[in-house]
């Protein structure tokens, strides 16, 4: 399933994120904020249980999360800021890291780092990466997690290309995709058009 998060606040901040005149500091802040906002949609079906708490004036019934263990796994390096935004809302989530880069010649992902919680196979995992372009990195990261025994995975990105969505759905049809926008296409270099450029470079001021 593909879920487009079209909340007005998300779309407002996404428009500013795309702007080529947005500098690294504001870009990081916007990505952080969009990721936090998108998490509400991603987690809206988490199980809850009813509890009672004592207020200064009496007893109130309420709901709390029902022991759903979560992990957030950013694809390095651009996914780091997204993970930070989500951790602000879910500070109890564990964090893993998967390092992948795209070979400029083949456009295939190359793995260079993986560090995951020991109990990752017992957790619902949210994989985050700002861009779903060719889909290669997302497919590779999710394959790594499944090899570790993870069964419940969601993928969250800011902008996606139709080609990347198709690739990910063909490889992992059980993984829901959350995105703030589906753009037109990929160019010959594997970049999303119109997109926002290279998210990692814009985040960290590199080229």
Swiss-Prot record:
Its cofactor is Mg(2+). It catalyses: UMP + diphosphate = 5-phospho-alpha-D-ribose 1-diphosphate + uracil. Uracil binds at residues 192, 197-199. It holds the Pfam family UPRTase. The keyword Membrane does not apply. Its EC number is 2.4.2.9. Allosterically activated by GTP. Binds 1 Mg(2+) ion per subunit. The magnesium is bound as Mg-PRPP. Catalyzes the conversion of uracil and 5-phospho-alpha-D-ribose 1-diphosphate (PRPP) to UMP and diphosphate. Belongs to the UPRTase family. This is Uracil phosphoribosyltransferase. It comes from Dictyoglomus thermophilum (strain ATCC 35947 / DSM 3960 / H-6-12).
């Amino acid at each position: 399933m593909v879920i487009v998060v079209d909340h007005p606040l998300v779309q407002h901040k996404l428009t500013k994120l795309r702007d080529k005149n947005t500098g690294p500091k504001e870009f990081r802040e916007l990505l952080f904020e969009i990721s936090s906002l998108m998490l509400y949609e991603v987690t809206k079906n988490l199980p809850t249980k009813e509890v009672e708490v004592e207020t200064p004036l009496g007893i109130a019934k309420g709901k709390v999360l029902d022991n759903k263990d979560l992990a957030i796994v950013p694809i390095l390096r651009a996914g780091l800021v997204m993970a930070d935004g989500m951790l602000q809302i879910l500070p109890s989530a564990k964090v893993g890291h998967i390092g992948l880069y795209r070979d400029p010649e083949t456009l295939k992902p190359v793995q260079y780092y993986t560090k995951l919680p020991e109990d990752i196979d017992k957790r619902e995992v949210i994989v985050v990466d700002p861009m779903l372009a060719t889909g290669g990195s997302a497919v590779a990261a999710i394959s790594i997690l499944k090899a570790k025994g993870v069964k419940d995975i969601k993928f969250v990105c800011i902008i996606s290309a139709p080609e990347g969505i198709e690739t990910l759905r063909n490889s992992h049809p059980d993984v829901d995709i959350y995105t703030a926008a589906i753009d037109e296409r990929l160019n010959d270099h594997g970049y999303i058009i119109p997109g926002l450029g290279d998210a990692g470079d814009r985040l960290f001021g590199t080229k």
